[in-house]
Amino acid sequence: MYRTLFSLVLSRFDPERAHRLAFAAIRALPVIGLGSLLRRFTAPDPSLAVEALGLRFDSPFGIAAGFDKDGEGVIGLGALGFGHVEVGTITARPQPGNDKPRLFRLLPDRAVINRMGFNNHGAGAAANRLLRVRRARRRPVLGVNISKSRAVAVEDATADYLISARALAPVADYLVVNVSSPNTPGLRGLQEREALAPLLSAVKAASGKKPLLVKIAPDLTDEQIVAVARLAVELGLAGIIATNTTIARDGLSSDPAVVEAAGAGGLSGAPLAARSLEVLTLIRANVPPSLCVISVGGVETAQDVQRRLDAGATLVQGYTAFLYRGPLWARQITRGLSALRSR
C-alpha cells in the first residue's frame, strides 16, 4: 500500500518536503501515545539480539545517520523497529546546510542524490535533546555521528571535532567520526592517514570510554581502505562504518539528463550495494573479529542484511530504502531475518 501511495502521491512532492512531513509524523508517535502500541507490532524476535560495542542491540539492523539529523525522532524510530538509531551528522556550530534544492530522487535506481551539507542545530542543542532521550524508559541504542563545521578551516578541524565530542559523548551510546561526506569542502581529505591519525587520537581521548567508530567513503582505493582499517585497529577504535555515499555515477538506469541536472552530491541507495559489500569484505579481512564493522549502503531487504552479516558485518544500517519502502521497513527486515534463520 505504501508503494502505491509513494508512486501516486509522495513521489510528486519535493523530496525534502516529503522527508519533513514523514519525519514530523515519526516525531509525533510517542507524543500521541502510539509508541508503545507500535512496539508490540514491530518488536524484533529476541533471537535477533546482538551484543556489540559493549551494548545490547535488539536486532542487527538500524537506521543510518542522515535521517534524524538532530536527534528529534529517536524514540519514534525505535518504535518502528530499528535496533539502533544513529543521529546526525552533528557539527559543533549550528549551520543551515547547502542551498536548496539539495535532495533528488532517482526513481529508476531506487536511489537518492543529496548535498544537504550537514544542516543541523549544533552540538549544544543536540546534547540537551539527547540527554532527555537517554532518560526514556524504552529507546533504541543511540549512536551520534559528528563532523567538521563548514565554517571551520580543515587545518582547525580537530579542535572543532573536539567541541562536538565533549558535548555529545556523554549522551551517546557510541560516537562516530564522519570524515567521508562529499558535501563539505575538504572533509574527505581527512581520510588520509597523516590527517586521520591525530584527529582520531584526539577525539578518542576526548570521548573517554565511549565506543568510537570512524565512517569512511566507498570511493577510497582498496589500499586506502586497508590503511584506514589498520589505523583503526592500531588506535584502539571500537569500529568502522562502511560506507558513506559515493560521488560515482556509474551504471545508473536513470536518464543521464536527470542525473546531470541533480548535480553534485553523494549518491545513496541500490547502486551502492556492490561497492559497499566489497568494502565490507575488504575491511573484515584486515581487522580482528572483535572489531565492530557496521555495513551501510544499498541495503533494501532482509536478504541484503543477512548477506552483509554473512560477509562479516557486526551490524547493518540503511536509510535510502526507508524513503522508498515506508514506515514498516524495519519490521519487514527483522521479520524477514527471522524467517531466513528459521529455514
From Swiss-Prot:
It is an enzyme of class 1 (oxidoreductase). One of its GO terms (biological process) is 'de novo' pyrimidine nucleobase biosynthetic process. Pathway: Pyrimidine metabolism; UMP biosynthesis via de novo pathway; orotate from (S)-dihydroorotate (quinone route): step 1/1. Its cofactor is FMN. Pfam families: DHO_dh. It comes from Leifsonia xyli subsp. xyli (strain CTCB07). Its main location: membrane. This is Dihydroorotate dehydrogenase (quinone). Monomer. CDD domains: DHOD_2_like. The keyword Acyltransferase does not apply. The active site is at residue 181. The gene is pyrD. FMN binds at residues 65-69, 89, 145, 178, 215, 243, 269, 298, 319-320. SUPFAM superfamilies: FMN-linked oxidoreductases. Its EC number is 1.3.5.2.
